[in-house]
From Swiss-Prot:
UniProt family annotation: Belongs to the oligoribonuclease family.
Encoding gene (name): orn
Pfam families hit by this protein: RNase_T
Annotated protein name in UniProt: Oligoribonuclease
Gene Ontology cellular component list: cytoplasm
InterPro entries from the UniProt entry: Exonuclease_RNaseT/DNA_pol3, Oligoribonuclease, RNaseH-like_sf, RNaseH_sf
């Protein structure tokens, strides 16, 4: 099942944007082939954090994660960051050899910053490159605004939904923004 051309898509929800003071509270992964066909998806993991950590969330995170039910799921979860890291490593290694896939998603550098701090073995399994859909979004805004405006975002702020939305957005840019030439077999 391992294929070096498979892509691993990831999304995390965090208590805030600063890995020095905030923590991971939800994470999920999806594996696609190089044509963006979904091959597998991980479990969606709510990562337990203490009330002390959750009570430090700002207004936006408190409201958003409260509305989605994530805050309650985090309180009820028994999954630690280390346990989730190992489960995701096990899942990922079934589909992709180590350091083969870029980390794929939207604003994925932010997830990577948290991974370096709280899930370093998982971060190390990825290639050092990122496939960041938000880069295409920023380019489309500047070079082809109608393409950028035609992307429909739901913004649920749930890890699995956000990954699926990122894959769909990448498909959109592939079809409407990237120039397609006859495809040679990947080497």
């Amino acid at each position: 099942m391992q294929d070096k051309n498979n892509l691993c898509w990831l999304d995390m929800e965090m208590t805030g944007l600063n890995p020095e003071t905030d923590r991971i509270i939800e994470v999920a992964m999806i594996i696609t082939d190089s044509d963006l066909n979904v091959l597998a998806q991980s479990e969606v993991y709510a990562v337990h954090q203490s009330d002390d950590v959750l009570n430090k969330m700002d207004e936006w995170n408190t409201a958003t994660h409260g509305r989605t039910g994530l805050t309650q799921r985090v309180r009820e979860s028994s999954h630690t960051e280390a346990e989730v890291e190992q489960k995701l490593l096990d899942f990922m290694s079934e589909w992709v050899p180590g350091r083969a896939t870029p980390m794929c998603g939207n604003s994925i550098h932010q997830d990577r910053r948290f991974m370096v701090k709280y899930m370093p073995k998982l971060e190390n399994y990825f290639h050092y490159r990122n496939l960041d859909v938000s880069t295409l979004k920023e380019l489309a805004k500047r070079w082809n605004p109608p393409v950028a405006k035609s992307v429909v975002k739901r913004g649920s702020h749930k890890a699995l939904d956000d990954i699926l939305e990122s894959i769909e957005e990448m498909r959109h840019y592939r079809e409407h923004f990237l120039i397609s030439a006859p495809r040679a077999e990947a080497q």
